[in-house]
Amino acid sequence: MPRALEPAEPILSAEGIPYSPRYDDVYHSTEGGLAQAAHVFLGGNGLPQAWAGQRQFVIVETGFGLGLNFLATWQAWRADPQRCGTLHFVSIEKHPFTREGLAQLHAGLDGLQPLAQALQAQWPLALPGLHRLAFDGGRVVLTLALGDIEQMLPRLAAGADAFYLDGFAPARNTEMWSPQVFRGLARLARPGARLATWAAAGFVRRGLKEVGFEVSRAPGFGGKWQMTVASFRPQWKARRHAPPLPAQWAERHAIVIGAGLAGCAVTERLAARGWRVTLFDGHDGPARQTSAHRAAAMHAHLSADDSLLSRLSRTGNQYALRAWAELAEAGHAVGWHGCGVLQIGEDEAEGEAQRAALAAMRLPEGFVRWMSAEEAAAAHHAGVPRGGLWFPQGGWVAPPDICSAQLAQAGAAVTARFGCRVAAIARVDGQWQALGQDGEVLASAPVLVLANAHEAQQLLPQQHWTMRRVRGQLTTLASAQVDALGGWPDCVVTGAGYLLPRTADGAGRVGSSYDADEGPLVEQPAVHAANLARLSGMLPRQADAVAAIDPATLSGYVGVRTVTHNRLPLVGQVPDEAAALAQAASLRGAHLRDLPRMPGLYAALAYGSRGLTWAALGAELLASQIEGEPLPLESDLADAMDPARLLLRALRHGHTG
């Protein structure tokens, strides 16, 4: 479990230099942070010349601090006519400043104020994990890894072209200069990757040399006579798992099958990277099946042990909010209602478990805090039976609006083939083909993404995906029925079910069932009755009024979710099951990266009831994998969603018959 992040304080030394009392050290030389960044890190890595003409360039930094190295690098990138197509800057920070602290310390950066203010505007809460921020139309991407370097560095999935080593002095911040850190840097280093640091201590140079860097001295900055520069040129040639290289696609064209939340998000993320996308869906428009309902809530999951689900949902929620904000800023109607979400336990025992999780995690109150029943009633008209977790960033949205905004943002890069069902897929001469009912080729591309939920199994049967369909029914209460209840919350409330604030016409929505997919897909009065029971449990003061509602008079929405055995989605490159099973004996001790994959075939499936949480993050993950970019989440979280994860389990346990 990650330790709670302790933000840094904006304190100045007697000389007016940002200072850390925690480490008793300053953040940069007295000669100036930007000048130090230019001499040590840009100059020491041969920048900007090293990125000239590259499609992408990846820098990994240890110690983000004030962000001066990032800002100086961004400024140099902007000023360089030979700049790389996309600049990725990945930085680890254990003690991030708050947004207000950054603004205070950036006040004197006259020439960099526009960049500094753009960084401050997107600055995340101090939440453990990865945070991806995009600038300059997505061509400059900052991935912040907030947490201990011992935890975060091994979880980075990236291939680095350059390293900035910028922790506090080794005598004061030993964990940033350990052999474990040097090994972690070598794991990420692409062939010939360069490294620079102001530190010139002998053990630093020796440690880098031991892991494969050729190390030399260079003139230092300010009061330091020397600094260290290096390039990754190990004597050994083979690495079991080499870091990803920039992908080389002969044609940047992808087929995406399925135009729900998953498929539309993938389409937009690929289009943002300059890809042409052919989007297929058998219905007459986007978001016509599971994503069709107009009442979806989103909030994070919280657990005392910070489980995979908790970490994934936290990262997914934060990324989705940023992605939707960018769509809204581009002029697209997203319709996000950030009213907040109150999650109450189903009973007192669950409420105590919530309190225990909150105390264990110690997350910022801007992300989650406790709200008493009294406060919920006074502030949000929510007559709940007990207090619960308040997620101020939570809310609700109509998924079709998200899908429409994403396709509008993709613009001319997408060719939408609605009303066109793909009957089969095939790989011919290095291209994936989408085939129609009569075997005709509807489209051909080097990359194909399956984003069509359970229907993917019809196109590509996989015995280790274990997807199943779960029915969900939502109940709508008319305005008069809501009025008769005598009160309705103005926030989302979740517990045994969930309810959403009233719509513009006064209606209320309550959900949702989670039943086996059996029989015709039609609304059932018995399920409406069950939803009313859920409503009574969440708002017990209105239970008598709820009991007066005849379920037979109600309407709503019914749909089918696709879920996996553990309710985590399938996102990533599709495994080659046949090839893996043929090599079962040799793969018994394999890792996910050892398994054979189907070239150019990817999945974004089984989002279940958390489509809002998974879709944007899953799309960014897929697009990053396709391009060979740093991943937007920790490697163990990507592994938790890998479409090959159950195949790997079967291979390890010998269950391949």
Swiss-Prot record:
Region (FAD-dependent cmnm(5)s(2)U34 oxidoreductase): 257-657
Keywords annotated in UniProt: Cytoplasm, FAD, Flavoprotein, Methyltransferase, Multifunctional enzyme, Oxidoreductase, S-adenosyl-L-methionine, Transferase, tRNA processing
Record-given protein name: tRNA 5-methylaminomethyl-2-thiouridine biosynthesis bifunctional protein MnmC
Transmembrane segments annotated in the record for this chain: none
UniProt entry tagged with the keyword Lipid biosynthesis: no
InterPro entries xrefs: FAD-dep_OxRdtase (IPR006076), FAD/NAD-bd_sf (IPR036188), MnmC-like_methylTransf (IPR008471), SAM-dependent_MTases_sf (IPR029063), tRNA_MAMT_biosynth_bifunc_MnmC (IPR023032), tRNA_MNMC2 (IPR047785), tRNA_S-uridine_synth_MnmC_C (IPR017610)
Organism this protein belongs to: Cupriavidus necator (strain ATCC 17699 / DSM 428 / KCTC 22496 / NCIMB 10442 / H16 / Stanier 337) (Ralstonia eutropha)
GO cellular component: cytoplasm
GO MF annotations in UniProt: flavin adenine dinucleotide binding; oxidoreductase activity, acting on the CH-NH group of donors; tRNA (5-methylaminomethyl-2-thiouridylate)(34)-methyltransferase activity
Free-text function comment from the UniProt entry: Catalyzes the last two steps in the biosynthesis of 5-methylaminomethyl-2-thiouridine (mnm(5)s(2)U) at the wobble position (U34) in tRNA. Catalyzes the FAD-dependent demodification of cmnm(5)s(2)U34 to nm(5)s(2)U34, followed by the transfer of a methyl group from S-adenosyl-L-methionine to nm(5)s(2)U34, to form mnm(5)s(2)U34.
Pfam (any one): Methyltransf_30
